[in-house]
Amino acid sequence: MIISAASDYRAAAQRILPPFLFHYIDGGAYAEYTLKRNVEDLSQVALRQRVLKNMSDLSLETTLFNETLSMPVALGPVGLCGMYARRGEVQAARAASAKGIPFTLSTVSVCPIEEVAPVMNRPMWFQLYVLRDRGFMRNALERAKAAGCSTLVFTVDMPTPGARYRDAHSGMSGTNAAMRRYWQAVTHPQWAWDVGLNGRPHDLGNISAYLGKPTGLEDYIGWLANNFDPSISWKDLEWIREFWDGPMVIKGILDPEDARDAVRFGADGIVVSNHGGRQLDGVLSSARALPAIADAVKGDITILADSGIRNGLDVVRMIALGADSVLLGRAYLYALATHGEKGVANLLNLIEKEMRVAMTLTGAKSIKEITRESLVPSPEFTSVLADLPAASAKPKQDDAA
């Protein structure tokens, strides 16, 4: 199969993966309205073409949390990566490190912190949820710090799991799920050999290290369901600051007021995100939410964005809408499932090339030159910004908590 875009990796991954794994990452919450709008809204953002600008010295390099990135992209946290390729987190981390960008390890990764961090030539990022088991949280933070992780990505949009109907149909959950998964595995021989047989242990490495016993897929579903904490508040983040003195990024912001709260709290960054449309269906796409949030807090806090990003054009669009950098999720997992580390490396090269083309043809020589001026207020773009809540003034210095 010819691979020329991220969409090709998705098609390839669908053939390789057992349905329960493909649909787990490909699907969203409820009717998947927000999942679709993430991609559609972003694709409607029109770039302003400029010519004769002498783009010979174009650079994608940027700085984020005192780290130099070869381009404004990081691999975001995705659970169960090691079920999509043999020791998947390790392979993805190697590809990111070789490209000069961050890799973010999920709390619910297959490979533990101690296995992934050493393969990188730059500090790893670590993602954490607020969970009822505060002992686990403290243990994870201490281990991440000991492994040299530089940045904590704190996911706050999962006080309860979203309703993902696809999972019940695909075999990830529901009646006779284990038997259905087994049958799917034996009928997908490439995955069965690479991951099913040779990718063991199929374990939640970070959780197993804490509990002192193996944890499989059923444990993953049950442990998380019982540990998400609906009482989460800003006080929990204050508690985390006792154990983490590095950069902290709050992931799951969709409202300008929450963004202002993150500034008041003293967070180093936010991720404008709806969890890839996997939590609450019907909320704003990240592309719709981002401009008002940027108007409210740009310059006061680092802004990252995810959800709906499929190529280098989308990266440029998100930056023009107000992001400083972006996180990739599904796009790199499809590539990982298809060709492992080489697939992720190739995807990142494709994204870089697409960004260079977009920047060359919009006259932006550097990431800082990608602004709202890089966009044209076409009918499609206007529809993306329509009905956004008006951004009020930034909080005064005296208002900071």
Curated annotation (Swiss-Prot):
Keyword Transmembrane helix: no
GO cellular component, one term: plasma membrane
Gene: lldD
Source organism (scientific name): Cronobacter sakazakii (strain ATCC BAA-894) (Enterobacter sakazakii)
Reaction(s) catalysed (UniProt annotation): (S)-lactate + A = pyruvate + AH2
Transmembrane regions listed in the UniProt entry: none
EC number: 1.1.-.-
Annotated HAMAP family: L_lact_dehydr
Residue ranges occupied by any FMN hydroxy acid dehydrogenase domain in the UniProt entry: 1-380
One matching Pfam family: FMN_dh
Biological process (GO), any one: lactate metabolic process
GO molecular function: FMN binding; L-lactate dehydrogenase activity
CDD domains reported in the protein's UniProt record: alpha_hydroxyacid_oxid_FMN
UniProt keyword Oxidoreductase, yes or no: yes
Family according to the record: Belongs to the FMN-dependent alpha-hydroxy acid dehydrogenase family.
Cofactors, names only: FMN
Subcellular location: Cell inner membrane
InterPro entries recorded: Aldolase_TIM, Alpha-hydoxy_acid_DH_FMN, FMN-dep_DH, FMN_HAD, FMN_hydac_DH_AS, LldD
PROSITE patterns on file: FMN_HYDROXY_ACID_DH_1, FMN_HYDROXY_ACID_DH_2
Sites where the protein binds FMN: 106, 127, 155, 251, 306-330
Classification via Gene3D superfamilies: Aldolase class I
Membrane topology: Peripheral membrane protein
Keywords: Cell inner membrane, Cell membrane, Flavoprotein, FMN, Membrane, Oxidoreductase
Described function: Catalyzes the conversion of L-lactate to pyruvate. Is coupled to the respiratory chain.
Binding positions for substrate per the UniProt entry: Y24, Y129, R164, R278
Main enzyme class: oxidoreductase
Residues at the catalytic site: H275 (proton acceptor)
Protein name as catalogued: L-lactate dehydrogenase
